[in-house]
Swiss-Prot record:
Compartments where located: Cytoplasm
GO terms for cellular component: cytosol
Protein name (Swiss-Prot/TrEMBL): tRNA uridine 5-carboxymethylaminomethyl modification enzyme MnmG
Essential cofactor(s): FAD
Length: 637
């Protein structure tokens, strides 16, 4: 077919949400010429749902994106109105940072970054078609019939693909926040042979701040102790003048209003057909599923410093507007609240992710990548994590360099992508700490130690950032060695000091590291015996040292498991394998292998429905094939 390309790019990214901006920034910073196309330029990196970044598991993803050289962490650190460390009373594996965002300022700040990025063109246009020749991407066609050439295309359309907003019995074509839906592109993806699913998400009503009675709600302040998402942010820039959130609850009257109107709820009348998120259900779904609960938490979250809009977190709904108004007014503190926006549900098309490789390239079409909600995930952070990986791998593919695949032991991003491509998802996927088997080594405090070197190798970590990282790493390594080299002996003077500090006396000589391993002993306690490090260590390095030492036994066991899985991941499965040629594997395993086409024994072992016996049979089969190939090669010599 003959195309009339008016412009040529290395990579075209369709959609400028949180996945799209990370993908386009990563690829352009790696030297590729990139076009970032969006239906509405005013909605770049917009937050159509909750005005926050981070949270359990998600906050760690933001730090991983930052460690790789992404932008989300830097932008939220410039635009937050509140910062809070979650789960501080629990172990280090589940601690995570969460920020309330000034959503308008966040979008503006990210747009400024995109507009000033070399090699990156931002354009408001609607892409209707991805152009493919001989199984390879060659470009795109817009709604205005312009054709742009590209060596790779990344689809990051969020909830816009055949999007439909639902409020009561009203249902109309729309993307998020009442933007245009992308209909023709949704049709095109089907025509290209991709399997498409239909998901649903929702958002709560927004109420006017000045109409809320805060006196009867519970204040939720931010942290005074400085914390940041980005490793480049400085404590002296930490915002002290933070905006609080407020806690209230549903009650018996609220539940009665919902129960009396279930016959008008799209969730229960059949109007909503898409599958909704398990871990962020609508309020009507919660009332039905958890009928024994007397109340549900609601957080009143300001959407910025210069707006009256307040997001009612926990009240996501698609009930009719009049019911929503009664529901809002039944809640303590919101009796006279003015509803500024109505809550709604949105249904949208998504690409079933078992069709993707771990690079986020589709198996069917070379050069076509997908990321974010297009792949069936929920959340800005999950989108950003996929976006940077898709952008990196699209650039590496074009440049003829080895691909980047994050393993489950590398980060939560690796866990998420492996879950998607290996297990698929039948509902909007949300990251949870429980999804990570190595969560003690995938912590909030060590994301830079895990991923900065990768970011440097692919060209996303600049010299200044790398120099700062090397200083931190050297300080950490040197102090760990020092603690392991200095001994505390059970002599009278030492034990007198130990007992004075309230600790059990020493019975044997121990290293400073072994002494610190005691649960009740802090790093500062150890320093009282051995003196400070040669260089001043900041609190974040001290926290990292304490965690690594106190949990060393558990971390060591996790690393042993990682080593075993690495051996499994190194055993490749040929792309052209004939699954029907393998005798004795279970029917379910054969079906799953055909569907997913795992690339390694490790990936095959994680497919649901595949048991250890199937893996053993597969390994015997591959070993037999390898011996057969070796014999053939020897005969031909």
């Amino acid at each position: 077919m003959t195309y009339h390309f008016t412009e040529e790019y290395d990579i075209i990214v369709i959609g400028a949400g949180h996945a799209g901006v990370e993908a386009s920034l990563a690829a352009s910073r790696m030297g590729c010429k990139v076009l970032l196309a969006t239906i509405n330029i005013e909605m770049l990196a917009f937050m159509p749902c909750n005005p926050s970044i981070g949270g359990s598991a998600k906050g760690i993803v933001v730090r991983e994106v930052d460690a790789l050289g992404g932008e989300m962490a830097k932008t939220i650190d410039k635009t937050y109105i509140q910062m809070k460390m979650l789960n501080t009373g629990k172990g280090p594996a589940v601690r995570a940072l969460r920020a309330q965002a000034d959503k308008e300022l966040y979008s503006k700040e990210m747009r400024k970054t995109v507009e000033n990025q070399e090699n990156l063109t931002l354009r408001q246009t609607m892409i209707d078609e991805i152009l493919v020749e001989d199984g390879k991407v060659v470009g795109v066609r817009t709604a205005t019939h312009q054709e742009y050439a590209a060596k790779a295309v990344i689809v990051t359309t969020g909830t816009a693909l055949r999007g439909e907003i639902i409020i009561g019995d009203l249902k109309y074509s729309s993307g998020p926040n009442h933007s245009l839906a992308s209909i023709n592109l949704a049709d095109n993806l089907k025509e290209l042979g991709l399997e498409i699913g239909r998901f649903k998400t929702g958002t709560p009503p927004r109420v006017k701040a000045s109409s809320i009675n805060y006196d009867v709600t519970e204040i939720q302040p931010g942290d005074e102790v400085p914390n940041h998402f980005s490793y480049t942010s400085r404590d002296e820039d930490y915002v002290k003048d933070q905006v609080p959130c407020w806690l209230t609850y549903t009650n018996g009257t609220s539940h009665e209003i919902i129960q009396n109107n279930l016959h008008r709820a799209p969730m229960f009348t059949g109007v909503v057909k898409g599958v909704g998120p398990r871990y962020c259900p609508s309020i009507e779904d919660k009332i039905v599923r958890f009928a024994d609960k007397e109340r549900h938490q609601l957080f009143l979250e300001p959407e910025g410093r210069n707006t009256e809009e307040v997001y009612v977190q926990g009240l996501s709904t698609s009930l009719p507007e009049d019911v929503q108004r009664d529901l809002v007014h039944s809640i303590k503190g919101l009796e006279n609240a003015e509803m500024m926006r109505t809550g709604y549900a949105i249904e949208y098309d998504m690409v079933l992710p078992h069709q993707l490789r771990a690079t986020l390239e589709t198996k069917k079409i070379s050069g076509l990548f997908t990321a974010g909600q297009t792949n069936g995930t929920s959340g800005y952070e999950e989108a950003a994590g996929q976006g940077i990986i898709a952008g990196i791998n699209a650039a590496l593919k074009i440049q003829g360099k080895p691909e980047l695949i994050l393993k489950r032991s590398d980060g939560y991003i690796g866990v998420m992508i492996d879950d998607l491509v290996t297990k698929g998802t039948i509902e909007p996927y949300r990251l949870l700490t429980s999804r990570a088997e190595y969560r003690l080594i995938l912590r909030h405090d060590n994301a830079d130690m895990r991923l900065t070197e990768m970011g440097r190798e692919i060209g996303l970590v600049d010299d200044e950032r790398w120099a700062r990282f090397e200083i931190k790493k050297n300080q950490f390594d040197n102090e760990m060695k020092r603690l392991d080299s200095i001994k505390l002996k059970p002599v009278k003077e030492t034990n007198a000091k130990v007992e004075e500090m309230g600790f059990k006396p020493l019975t044997d000589a121990v290293t400073a590291k072994e002494f610190l391993r005691r649960p009740e002993v802090s790093y500062q306690d150890v320093v009282a015996f051995i003196g400070p490090a040669a260089e001043d260590l900041d609190d974040k390095i001290i926290e990292l040292i304490e965690t690594e030492i106190k949990y060393e036994g558990y971390i060591s066991k996790a690393m042993d498991q990682v080593a075993k899985m690495k051996r499994m991941e190194e055993k490749r499965i040929p792309a052209n394998i004939d699954w029907d040629d393998i005798d004795s594997i279970a029917t379910e395993a054969r079906q799953k292998f055909k569907l997913i086409n795992p690339e390694t024994i490790g990936q095959a072992s994680r497919i649901s429905g595949v048991n250890p016996a199937d893996i053993s049979i597969l390994m015997v089969y591959l070993e037999g094939k390898n011996r057969s190939i070796s014999k053939t090669l020897q005969k031909s010599k």
